[in-house]
């Protein structure tokens, strides 16, 4: 049986200030925990049902000192999602390490993306399209929010995020790199040519788009052509469309299924 202190500690990590205080966060569900166990994240503990440990006996035996057996009832009482029926991990957060676009590399920039589900989805999309770095404004939602982690489906283990003041960051680091921003009124994405030298792609806030302070650094405004009557696209969907068009301009890079 889990101790009261253990239950209190895990539950506290659902709140941002306690994640920051303890420098820890929670990861729920078999897929995400399995990816976590194969990553470079430092894991404090894994609370798992007996069934999970038996099903994945090889990997659980490799990390047996981390595992603590719990019942399904205990697990569902701790987690944020009732669909979690296998495991939950407590993990140390990483340092907020500086990131920038290297030669021929594209980096995503998120300007005040506020919805955790959207951020998690964008991380997953970035992973799919081979984007390894995301630079976030200080007001972008916390990457360690349980909803972000869940929506990323394990991709948080492969995509690095850096939080910073975007205006200062771009002023110092953009240099002669292309900085493309997603806007409602810009050059058609279908006609835009992403340079092989790489650069930055900015996605804005769900309601307000790219802020004025960040817009100053945009060298190319691009838009996804609209054919129907919808007012706008979800920022996650828009990110996928833009990255897909970017990769379409490259030949022989994608991994076939």
Question: Can you say where each PLM-predicted feature lies in the sequence?
Answer:
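Short, aromatic/basic amphipathic alpha-helical patches
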Residues: 54-64, 214
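Short beta->alpha connector loops at strand-helix junctions that form conserved
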Residues: 70-71, 111, 137-138, 160, ...
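RNA substrate-binding interface of SAM-dependent RNA methyltransferases
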Residues: 38, 95, 100-186
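Boundary-proximal intrinsically disordered activation/regulatory segments immediately upstream
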Residues: 1-54, 140-141
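Glycine/small-residue-rich loop that forms an oxyanion/phosphate-binding "nest" at active or ligand-binding sites
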Residues: 67-92
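Structured adenosyl-cofactor binding patch, chiefly the S-adenosyl-L-methionine
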Residues: 86-89, 128-129, 143-157, 212-256
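Active-site/ligand-binding-proximal alpha/beta "capping" segment
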Residues: 181-228
């Amino acid at each position: 049986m889990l101790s009261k202190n253990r239950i209190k500690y895990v539950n506290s990590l659902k709140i941002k200030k306690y994640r920051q205080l303890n420098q820890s966060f929670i990861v729920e569900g078999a897929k995400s925990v399995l990816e976590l166990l194969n990553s470079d994240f430092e894991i404090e503990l894994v609370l798992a049902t007996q069934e999970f440990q038996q099903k994945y006996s090889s990997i659980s035996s490799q990390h047996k000192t981390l595992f603590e057996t719990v019942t399904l009832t205990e697990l569902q009482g701790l987690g944020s999602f009732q669909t979690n029926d296998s495991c939950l991990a407590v993990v140390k957060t990483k340092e907020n390490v500086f990131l920038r676009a290297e030669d021929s590399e594209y980096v995503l920039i998120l300007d005040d993306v506020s919805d955790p589900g959207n951020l998690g989805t964008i991380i997953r999309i970035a992973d799919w399209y081979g984007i390894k770095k995301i630079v976030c404004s200080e007001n972008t939602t916390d990457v360690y929010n349980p909803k972000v982690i869940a929506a990323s489906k394990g991709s948080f283990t492969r995509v690095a995020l850096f939080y910073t003041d975007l205006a200062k960051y771009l002023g110092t680091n953009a240099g002669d790199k292309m900085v493309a921003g997603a806007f409602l009124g810009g050059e058609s994405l279908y006609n835009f040519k992403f340079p092989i030298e790489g650069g930055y792609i900015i996605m804005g806030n769900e309601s307000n788009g790219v802020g004025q302070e960040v817009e100053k650094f945009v060298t190319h405004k691009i838009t996804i052509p609209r054919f129907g009557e919808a007012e706008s696209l979800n920022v996650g969907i828009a990110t996928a469309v833009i990255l897909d068009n970017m990769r379409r301009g490259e030949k022989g890079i994608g991994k076939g299924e």
